[in-house]
Amino acid sequence: METIRKLSEKNRDINAKPAVAIAFLGDSVTQGCFEVYTTETGGIETVFDAENAYHTHLRKILNTLFPAAALNIINAGISGGCARGGLERIERDVLRYSPDMCVVCFGLNDTGNYGIEEYKAALTGIFDRLLKEGVEVIFMTPNMMCTKISCHIKEENIRKVGEDILNNQVSGKLGQYLEAAKKIAVSKNIPVCDCYSKWKTLENSGVDTTELLANHLNHPTRDMNWLFAYSLVETMFEN
């Protein structure tokens, strides 16, 4: 990808080339959310830990490969975010920074909030807006959500949320949304970093993927964020 070429050139000559910027537009996983808990007022809140989010790991990898190249990360993830909201805030949260590349990752919340046609329309709008501004794009599919209600979830309000999330996963709804999204990306020559398929491979090989979720709902553990990072590096070098 052009962004890899820019990193390589910056690494060779730190004075002649500008710093590289990569934006990440997505939901809670992109923002860096992990465990959840019940607040004093009965609401549900999440633990924020962006230092262990996948884009932080990606930066570490790229800094290892191109140690002299300045790399700026733009975290445009918002907990609870959907593709529709991403399109609405793309100017404020992404384009104003003129990134060289943007990784787009939506789907987890979309299945519970919007129909598939709205999801497809919003993603199409995001892709078109980025491409119009000359920003390289990668569409990254998310992790799997829970395939059972974990015994680790004790609070009834969180278990209730988990039931809806579980249904969207085991019914095949999330997979349906992501297949549609991948087709849109391919039609626009946008590389797809298909992490969802890797999670499905783990499940089909007997791995309890629900145990790989920090909140046992839809946020991957800190260690599993490395899967996103390494997968993105592969995508960046292979396209």
Question: Each predicted region: which residue ranges?
Answer:
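Serine-esterase "nucleophile elbow" of acetyl-processing enzymes
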Residues: 1-76, 89-98
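Cell-envelope and extracellular/periplasmic
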Residues: 28-29, 38, 42, 46, ...
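Short, solvent-exposed loop/turn segments at secondary-structure boundaries
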Residues: 36, 85, 113-118, 169
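Structural motif
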Residues: 80-88
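Extracellular glycan-modifying ectodomains
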Residues: 92-100, 108-111, 116, 129
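Charged helix-capping and loop-helix junction motifs
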Residues: 116-124, 177
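A short helix->loop->beta-strand "cap" motif at the edges of active sites that frequently abuts
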Residues: 132-137, 190
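Catalytic His-Asp segment of secreted/periplasmic serine-dependent ester chemistry enzymes
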Residues: 144-239
